[in-house]
Structure formats: structure tokens, C-alpha cells
């Protein structure tokens, strides 16, 4: 079962983590309070690990910073998230 965790519209940078102050809150003990940042720049999606305890991975590869493409698996701690880049009007 997939759970859709949409990034709030109207921004180009989103913080992900366990704390409620994040743009996307993911409640799991293996995720740091402020774990990673997703950023959209010139139609390219980037993710940056923010010195998290358990790391950030794209398709199994540990990264400090990397490019996200449609269908990638983004792992924060032990939580896998499917990255889906939607066009306006497209649904998951």
C-alpha cells in the first residue's frame, strides 16, 4: 500500500523529518528531526541530507546530495518513500 505524502505547493524547497516544523513530517524513530531537504531548481529535483543520524539514500545509494528522478526510492532512515514528479493535473 502506498501512502501519498505531497509536498506543499508554492515552494521550491521543502524540509523533511520527524519534527512537526518540517514541510513534510514523517513520524518514524529512524528519521532525524530535520533529516533532509528536497529542492527544485531549473526543473531538476535535488535531495540533500542534513547531517541525519541514519542517512539518506536514493535507490539504495547513500548520498549527501543527489538528483531525484521520477520513480526513485528515497530512503530516510529506514523509511522508503517513492518519489513521483507529477505534472499539473496529474494524479498518483
Regions found by a protein language model. Name each.
Residues 46, 53, 57-92:
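C-terminal boundary/linker segments immediately following FHA domains
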Residues 1-30, 89:
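N-terminal beta-hairpin/loop module of FHA
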Residues 15-18, 40, 46:
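Structural recognition of beta-strand segments within beta-rich domains
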Residues 9, 40-42, 51:
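A generic beta-sheet turn/junction motif
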Residues 29-32, 52:
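Loop/turn elements at beta-strand to alpha-helix junctions within RNA-recognition modules
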Residues 36-38:
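Buried hydrophobic-core signal for structured, non-transmembrane domains
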Residues 26-27, 34, 58-59:
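Thr-Gly-centered strand-to-loop micro-motif
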